[in-house]
Amino acid sequence: MKSRYIITIICLSVLLVAIYFNWKYEVVAINLIGGEEDSELKVMTWNVHCSEGADIIRQRKIAEIILNEDADFVQLNEYNLDSCTVIDSLLKIKYPFTEEYQSHQICGDIFYSKRQMTNSGHVWIPIQGKSIQTIKATIRVASDSVQILGVHMASNHYDGIAFEKEFQSDTTSYEKYKYAQESRSFQAHWTKKAILESKHPVIVMGDMNDFNSSPPLDTLMSCGLKDSWWEGGNGYGSTYHDCWMLLRIDHILYSKELKLKSVKVKDTDLSGHNPVVAGFSVSK
């Protein structure tokens, strides 16, 4: 009888610890929101891994997914406009307004919008020789405007196979992760300044290459932003898949003035990342 009591206490303790860490680090979301509720603003972010282009069939499939989602505003990471002409020509029919940033010769980020954008451009980040950039645009929604900031934060530069090799050879991928995290934190710091200066509700989205409760995410969320998946998703919601690694590193963060109506991660094998889609109500 005593041993059963001890086992029960241990199991309850483990459960409470697991619940605490899940709450603290926002790992597995549990929410009642579900389905596709009507929204005034629907946004989508996706790292399409097209920095060096893609074959025509893959480009058409990528465009088809985006068009079928019918978001009002789309951000694509690792996108080269010069070599993704098929995607661009198909999207331009529905999304006539664009804002592009090409961080270096083969890689960039782009906004596609149904609505005209104002105050578009780049957030000033005082660093040279680095492909660190946050793009921005303001769009009119209902009786208000929303400031959208698109980020693609520094990668850790390893995939599942490389990580396994480093682990086996006793070199530490953690050091590589922390080095890249410093760059992400730097970008988050200057993006935070843009958030605080905004006169409108803000959405920050993109491939952030980091997890909830990491320093870069904490910096952004210290402005009062909420994570759409944690607030409205269900389950782990992995957005990155490579070999055995399943990570949630693509995020849509939003101001408390916006009301989250829906959020989902769409499974696809067209990229190493899955697109994240969220719908919001803007009217007060």
Task: List where the protein language model places each region.
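Active-site beta-strand/loop signature of hydrolases that rely on acidic residues for catalysis
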Residues: 41-48, 62-85, 137, 148-151, ...
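Membrane-proximal juxtamembrane linkers immediately C-terminal to transmembrane helices
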Residues: 34-40
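Solvent-exposed, acidic/flexible segments
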Residues: 55-59, 80, 105, 130, ...
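Short hydrophobic/aromatic-enriched beta-strand-loop microsegments
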Residues: 48, 94-101, 225-230
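Acidic/histidine-rich helix-loop elements
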Residues: 45-59, 157-181
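Structured beta-strand-rich core segments of catalytic domains in phosphoester-bond hydrolases
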Residues: 16, 21-33, 55, 64-67, ...
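Short, solvent-exposed loop/turn segments at secondary-structure junctions
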Residues: 50-51, 81, 115-117, 153-156, ...
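Metal-dependent phosphoester-hydrolase catalytic domains
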Residues: 1-33, 193-202, 208-284
